[in-house]
Amino acid sequence: MKVKFTMLVTAMIVLSLGTLHAQTPSKPAGGFDRLKVLAGEWQGTDESGKPVTSTFRLVSNDTALEETFQSDKDKEMVTMYTPDGSRVALTHYCSKGNQPKMESPAVTATADEFAFTFTGATNLASPEDTHLHHLVLQIDDAEHFTETWTIHEKGHDTKRVFKFTRRK
């Protein structure tokens, strides 16, 4: 009887430890940790010198990075960056009403360039409809970063470059 009771207690302890481990959130990918340095407010210009702003903030217990982008040309847009194993994934909530999804290759905590490639979209009637198809985010230094967008429309790609400086 004592042996059965001891085995039962041991099994319960082992099972509870497994449950405890399963509830512990996994550590975000190193590349995602690097993106966290962007938290804050940024002022920038597009390739023609027109003003743009971007605000980054950590949300969901620091497991997602929200970017809110505003230009004179476009209505406000939001991009959510999240860890996906050793990669970083994003969903761009475009002012056109579609939501392109992209992913970077595996990146490390010391990476300064994140090249996101299109993996799919929601609310995109046709792949030829206007949408953000690639995004390269380059962290130049603690006070500067650059975003290069590739917009795909009717079989043609157009690049837009935005250079940002941290607001003080």
Positions of PLM-derived features:
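Bacterial N-terminal signal peptides that target proteins for export
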Residues: 1-9
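Hydrophobic small-molecule pocket/channel-lining residues, especially in calycin-type beta-barrels
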Residues: 23-168
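Bacterial N-terminal signal peptides
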Residues: 9-18
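Polar low-complexity intrinsically disordered regions
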Residues: 1, 19-21
